[in-house]
Amino acid sequence: MVLSTVNLTLIEELAAQALALEDLTPEQGLLLLQCDDPGGWEVIRQYGDRLRRKLVGETVTYVVNRNINFTNICEQHCNFCAFRRDDGQTGAYWLTDSEIFNKTKGAVAQGATEICLQGGLNPQAKINGSSLAYYVNLVETIKGQFPQLHLHGFSPQEIQFIARQDGLTYGEVLMALKFSGLDSLPGTAAEVLVDRVRRIICPEKIDSQTWLEIIGLAHRHGLPTTSTLMAGHVETPEEIITHLDRLRQRQQTSLAQGYAASITEFILLPFVGEKAPPSLRKRVGRDQPDLDQALQIMAIARLYLGKWIVNHQPSWVKLGLTGATTALEWGCNDLGGTLMEEHITTMAGAKGGTCLTATQLQNAIISTGRPYQQRTTLYEHLNANLNKIGLK
């Protein structure tokens, strides 16, 4: 149905409530997300953009980083994943310490301030029978030679995997990795934090509560995390709002408890199905992300997460640089990283590419009439690449 004038008025009232930094209820968030009127969506877009401006200003940030997926050998079989391989299967790989070191060295030569380190769950990845020892060695391989780098690594799923392999608590794993030099965790493996969805797309992964528990423990132990949502597959609008609500509650709890760290950003990861396993690909019915849907979710995320998670980032790997740049008008304030390489999404059939230069990111930002700023992983500004162009 087409929303009536009264309902359009309600849309604006709710968006204005979010702009006033008053938290939306799940019911209110769902009402916004289910808007089916172009005029209503323009209101939501405008308010998302205004809230972005209020919380973080006009400057668009980016980070110079390198993504290292150290292995695609994985014991799990997620129904959306085209990256994983069994050991010995065609296309399987496992980087050596030397290869990881050389990739890091190359990244530093290109000005990287961050290495993002993630991989498949490989039961053979052990040193002297210990999974934790292997992961500690990964951290030390990088931080031992490049202590200035921020090491952003290991999702909650990887933390659970290490703990399960070695019979340790999550806290013990997190503390050992932090002591070795790990600086923060990516909030990947969240997918959708609703177990009905997880049973369909990733039945072997940790459940929603475990993901949230590990994120909270990371914060408690002083390790910042990001947060993500993979949308555009089998989830419902209600489940998108539930996911956002659980992220917001997790952040509120970490801040209320006075933990030394918290969630630094929210990233939408639209589903890419071109090379995904056939069952889910057929069920979803399209191979590439729906840009309009992604933009709408990003605007809703900005309004719903409000003052609690203020940095919002689109995925240029999934949406392409043009799509990601458009997201800067829908509540986003960051364009992410240069990456230098990326395998997980690319192997799923994404068309956005695997590497962008800082200049390409800067030019995309300039095209919006907003200034750019190079940042660190934790959103501290780096003065080397500050652009003070006039705003439109």
UniProtKB/Swiss-Prot annotation:
Give the NCBIfam families listed for this entry.
Answer: CofH family radical SAM protein, F420_cofH, PRK07360.1
**GO MF annotation list:** 4 iron, 4 sulfur cluster binding; 5-amino-6-(D-ribitylamino)uracil--L-tyrosine 4-hydroxyphenyl transferase activity; 7,8-didemethyl-8-hydroxy-5-deazariboflavin synthase activity; iron ion binding
What family is reported?
Belongs to the radical SAM superfamily. CofH family.
Q: Which HAMAP family match?
A: FO_synth_sub2
Cofactor: how and how many bound = Binds 1 [4Fe-4S] cluster. The cluster is coordinated with 3 cysteines and an exchangeable S-adenosyl-L-methionine.
Q: In which pathway does it act?
A: Cofactor biosynthesis; coenzyme F0 biosynthesis
Enzyme class, spelled out: transferase
- InterPro entries xref list: Aldolase_TIM, CofH/MnqC-like_C, CofH_family, F420, FO_synthase_su2, rSAM
What are its cofactors? [4Fe-4S] cluster
Species the sequence originates in: Synechocystis sp. (strain ATCC 27184 / PCC 6803 / Kazusa)
**Domain Radical SAM core stretches:** 60-307
| Superkingdom of this protein's organism | Bacteria
Q: Which gene encodes it?
A: cofH
Function per UniProt: Catalyzes the radical-mediated synthesis of 5-amino-5-(4-hydroxybenzyl)-6-(D-ribitylimino)-5,6-dihydrouracil from 5-amino-6-(D-ribitylamino)uracil and L-tyrosine.
Put simply, this protein is called 5-amino-6-(D-ribitylamino)uracil--L-tyrosine 4-hydroxyphenyl transferase
Assembly and interaction partners = Consists of two subunits, CofG and CofH.
Residues involved in [4Fe-4S] cluster binding: 74, 78, 81
Which reaction equations make up its catalytic activity? 5-amino-6-(D-ribitylamino)uracil + L-tyrosine + S-adenosyl-L-methionine = 5-amino-5-(4-hydroxybenzyl)-6-(D-ribitylimino)-5,6-dihydrouracil + 2-iminoacetate + 5'-deoxyadenosine + L-methionine + H(+)
Signal sequence segment: none
Alphabetized, the UniProt keywords read: 4Fe-4S, Iron, Iron-sulfur, Metal-binding, S-adenosyl-L-methionine, Transferase
Q: What is its EC number?
A: 2.5.1.147
Output the Pfam families linked to this UniProt entry: CofH_C, Radical_SAM
